[in-house]
Amino acid sequence: MTTFHVAGFPRVGAKRELKFAQERYWRGEIAEQDLLEIAQKLREINWKHQAAANADFVAVADFTFYDHILDLQVATGAIPARFGFDSQNLSLNEYFQLARGNQTQFAIEMTKWFDTNYHYLVPEFTKNTEFKANPAHYVQQIREAKALGFKFKPTIVGPLTFLWLGKEKGEAFNRFELLAKLVPVYVEILNALVAEGAEWIQIDEPALAVDLPTEWIEAYKAVYTTLKEKVKAKLLLATYFGSVAEHAPLLKGLPVDGLHIDLVRAPAQLAAFEDYNKVLSVGVIDGRNIWRANLNQVLDVVEPLKAKFGENLWIAPSCSLLHTPYDLEVETQLKANKPELYSWLAFTLQKVQELRVIKTALEQGRGAVQAELDASQAAADARANSKEIHRPEVAERLANLPTDADKRKSPFAERIAKQNAWLNLPLLPTTNIGSFPQTVEIRQARAKFKKGELSVADYEAAMKKEIEFVVRRQEELDLDVLVHGEAERNDMVEYFGELLDGFAFTKFGWVQSYGSRCVKPPVIYGDVVRPEPMTVRWSQYAQSLTNKVMKGMLTGPVTILQWSFVRNDIPRSTVCKQIGVALSDEVLDLEKAGIKVIQIDEPAIREGLPLKRADWDAYLQWAGEAFRLSYMGVQDDTQIHTHMCYSEFNDILPAIAGLDADVITIETSRSDMELLTAFGDFKYPNDIGPGVYDIHSPRVPKAEEIERLLRKALNVVPKERLWVNPDCGLKTRGWPETIAQLEVMMEVTKKLRAELN
């Protein structure tokens, strides 16, 4: 027998049922009991799908109403004291307030779950954090699964990863010191699961795939010795998202009953675990991407392992399936329009069926599943040879780029002099990051146009009306460099994906980003080409309305890559450079059309950093090159802007400077300009526009707040190189606060200008 198991399933449901139920509950349209019943139904459906695929265990304790790390904060009693809630008797309403904030407390901070596009809620630890077990949420799920007759395996994030993912608050201390207090509470939680009949418990320690300090690594032995001694269940220690080969001696010596390793992200690490003498669970189906596996190739890897490990070989997805959409079969439109592409994909329900085939082949031989293996092989062969994917001219163009293709003609000092000569901007020039409010009217017009209820002419007229409105408001505010407002764009990545060859879109390919927010990433399946201009006519129209400078707006190659499902048959770096080269055609067309200030947004450049420091340089090298390729060939007097929004720059500043954008605008208001200090210390050479107010809130900042931030900025950046702008785009704001916020920004800028002049 070969054990097949899953670490977790998507929580939101095939049609985002959980999202819609949560939002109705928050609006007071359904009662708590209704939400609980919908959630229970979704869990039951998930378990039935796993059982139907012949899984030996169904995953329990993986379901959450918002986030699994928030659930763990509740289960360990580690919720922030500032809320004043009792973790032992937390209501569902209070649970949601932790995630979303309330009148007196801001929400728990959110950040990316390792290098995925899922966000978790960051635990807040203080020196005096006291832990207290409350496993009710997990116990409830086990009882439901038992009542339905399923054999189950709970999955819970382990104590070291849980601590690692948190942040210290208040008095200075090292959160590692809390480990001794946390482990006994884990023992209590795990024993509550054992009392419900859990024979195996999966404990996830993905932190093992990052650069952990030595004391953290060394703690694994003591922690797992304690857990094994005091918990009467078999423990499966799971790692994923990267290689843990360097820790193989430690992991193989831990007193656990099995290990799970990710062979999709790190196939080479298998060699380090082939002599393991307990259960080895191998993640052989990609839990993070949507491509169908070549099952013959997977069997080539696992059949020798079966011969060696026998019943101790387990098979699984590489990680939780939370990161993949639910079911390919509902994509009837994709199947009709792109049948070949459809045949290359596998969503969650298809992935568990792939594991069923592998399990059957290992138990009964390949002949027992020959038809499925043949279909898998045919899809793999078709994909390898498809004309739709492989366009020789794209590879040729990349191969023949001159060695200095990604370099500007002249250094910044010479370029900026030429730019200033024609731009003729005042000191502290003002601009916006790009988008303006997406009103109900804009969204309705776009929806009607997509459904065919609005003609091309009527849709374009509606968008032009909106663009004119945005231009006039900016003129009234007396901003210096204007934007067209992006009314025609649904999303900063999807918009470009729809206009570039090599991209496709699903209708129901939603994955959870956080809480009730889901995203539907584009699918990059083939070589990327820009068949025709994408933004030129909109920017040209906007420029025709005003004598002020109009800025063109594009999304950069790294962000498009990061926020998509990316093909896995060529390196990500190659895909990224293809996108950069395709965007360069757009940049040159904008320049030709008289748009000579062009912003290329890269909010996701930091997100792409590999988990291990040793791999950073290689990534930053190709990401930087792809960005620079996106503006290759522009004239010195064309001004390239970029925008970035996140809070940690210090460790990648040389790479940011290496992008060689003439102007960088960054999100800094919420960190009180702290970020700028790093730019100052580094002596960042080009122009900078630090955000002077937070666009995530409808609040209108006071003049003195913006003035204080700008004066702080002037202490770091020479006045000749300082721009003034909001933190980010204004898409999610309403018009009244947008105008009021920008009025304050302009008032303060003019006051300081007069003073500096």
Curated annotation (Swiss-Prot):
Domain of life: Bacteria
Family annotation (InterPro entries): Cbl-indep_Met_Synth_N, Cobalamin-indep_Met_synthase, Met_Synth_C/arc, UROD/MetE-like_sf
Enzyme class name: transferase
GO molecular function: 5-methyltetrahydropteroyltriglutamate-homocysteine S-methyltransferase activity; zinc ion binding
Protein EC: 2.1.1.14
CDD domains in alphabetical order: CIMS_C_terminal_like, CIMS_N_terminal_like
Nuclease in keyword set: no
Listed pathway(s): Amino-acid biosynthesis; L-methionine biosynthesis via de novo pathway; L-methionine from L-homocysteine (MetE route): step 1/1
Active site: 696
Catalytic activity: 5-methyltetrahydropteroyltri-L-glutamate + L-homocysteine = tetrahydropteroyltri-L-glutamate + L-methionine
UniProt key word Transcription regulation: no
Keyword list, A-Z: Amino-acid biosynthesis, Metal-binding, Methionine biosynthesis, Methyltransferase, Repeat, Transferase, Zinc
Cofactors (names): Zn(2+)
Pfam families: Meth_synt_1, Meth_synt_2
Cofactor comment text: Binds 1 zinc ion per subunit.
Residues where Zn(2+) binds: 643, 645, 667, 728
Sites where the protein binds 5-methyltetrahydropteroyltri-L-glutamate: 16-19, 112, 517-518, 563, 607
Sites where the protein binds L-methionine: 433-435, 486, 601
Amino-acid positions noted as binding L-homocysteine in the UniProt annotation, renumbered to this chain: 433-435, 486, 601
UniProt GO BP: methionine biosynthetic process; methylation
General function of this protein: Catalyzes the transfer of a methyl group from 5-methyltetrahydrofolate to homocysteine resulting in methionine formation.
HAMAP family reported for this sequence: Meth_synth
Similarity-based family: Belongs to the vitamin-B12 independent methionine synthase family.
Matching NCBIfam families: met_syn_B12ind, PRK05222.1
Protein name in UniProt: 5-methyltetrahydropteroyltriglutamate--homocysteine methyltransferase
Gene: metE
